[in-house]
Amino acid sequence: MPPKKADDGPKQHPIIGRFGTSLKIGIVGLPNIGKSTFFNVLTKSQAAAENFPFCTINPNESRVPVPDERFEFLCQYHKPASKVPAFLNVVDIAGLVKGASTGQGLGNAFLSNISACDGIFHLMRAFDDDDIIHVEGSVNPVRDIEIIHEELRLKDEEMIIAALDKLEKVAVRGGDKKLKPEYDIMCKVKNWIIDEKNHVRFYHDWNDKEIDVLNKYLFLTSKPMIYLVNLSEKDYIRKKNKWLIKIKEWVDKYDPCALVIPFSGVLELNLQDMSDEEKHKYLQEKVTQSVLSKIVKTGYAALQLEYFFTAGPDEVRAWTIKKGTKAPQAAGKIHTDFEKGFIMAEVMKFDDFKEEGSESSVKAAGKYRQQGRNYTVEDGDIIFFKFNTPQQSKKK
């Protein structure tokens, strides 16, 4: 057996979710919990935000730049003519109500909007305000989490029953052996979601073949979820709220790999109207900070996305790729010719570039690497691709 190439790396396991880089994360929650306000401050847009259920009917969508100090450093260093950061696609989806899976509220339209997304910002209200009605009559974010979770699970249940009915006709009664493995896997999924009333992502030991089947159906409960707790400005600043511990306990029990991020929509909205100087002074006085950057970065990472940089005086750009992407496919994000004629990737680590101060110094320090087609691109790599065309060899 020939020796394994040094840059082959460990075997890549498939990721649950849609393949690609034009992925979306949806803001999901009950009506009147601050979704549109959060969307507005996140995207600096002016989507309608009113005090009545279903203010958002058709989903609003926007691209949000992913904040990154590495990108800013490269821009300051090169002073390029063009600056292109990575972006997170965010969708503001109409409020869900109990019974949506059976058509209540906006029902199936709402759930189809979630289906079109690849991750979920699960927003919940943990502030009291007599002027803002709550669709359930009282503020109880743990109850609200359970409503959302159950509606998503029920929609998946509907999809599983339909799929199993079809597979049983073909694979079991029809004797199609090719579909029998899919049928067996779907029986396991049924047991997990319908019989045990769990979400797909709560099970962490799906094997490669099972993940392939899950990715065929893209169940709502398979989507990564980040829990965002909307607090009053007062509670956020003092870091105290009676619901925070209860929410954390629920998430730790049922969705232990998920993150819970408290924020204040009112605070973020107020900060948006301030100048940079006023904002800095206000945050210092209140001994607090905005968490919008953290939320955007967390959402981007939850979609299994990362990026590499190309950097020079013409342009500094962050190129979005899926985690685990090999060098030729990363090159193809720039141009298909780069992938077709791939020769090598010349790679610098950002930290090495920052420490050494220039590309030539990185080379002199022996930290400039030439990587082949089996190299897995890492987040923050600074890359120059060499590739062949029918006419000549080029470098970018």
From Swiss-Prot:
Cofactor (UniProt): Mg(2+)
Predominant subcellular localization, coarse grouping: cytoplasm
Coiled-coil regions listed: none
Pfam families given in the database record: MMR_HSR1 (PF01926), YchF-GTPase_C (PF06071)
Binding positions (ATP): N32, I33, G34, K35, S36, T37, L231
Matching PROSITE patterns: G_OBG, TGS
Residues reported to bind Mg(2+): S36, T56
Localisation per UniProt entry: Cytoplasm; Nucleus; Nucleus, Nucleolus
GO cellular component: cytoplasm; nucleolus
Alphabetic keyword roster: ATP-binding, Cytoplasm, Hydrolase, Magnesium, Metal-binding, Nucleotide-binding, Nucleus
Domain TGS: 304-387
Motif Nuclear export signal mapped to chain: 267-274
Gene Ontology molecular function: ATP binding; ATP hydrolysis activity; GTP binding; metal ion binding; ribosomal large subunit binding
Domain OBG-type G: 23-283
Subunit description: Monomer.
Family matches, as HAMAP family: YchF_OLA1_ATPase
Function recorded in the entry: Hydrolyzes ATP, and can also hydrolyze GTP with lower efficiency. Has lower affinity for GTP.
Family: Belongs to the TRAFAC class OBG-HflX-like GTPase superfamily. OBG GTPase family. YchF/OLA1 subfamily.
Name of this protein: Obg-like ATPase 1
Organism: Xenopus tropicalis (Western clawed frog)
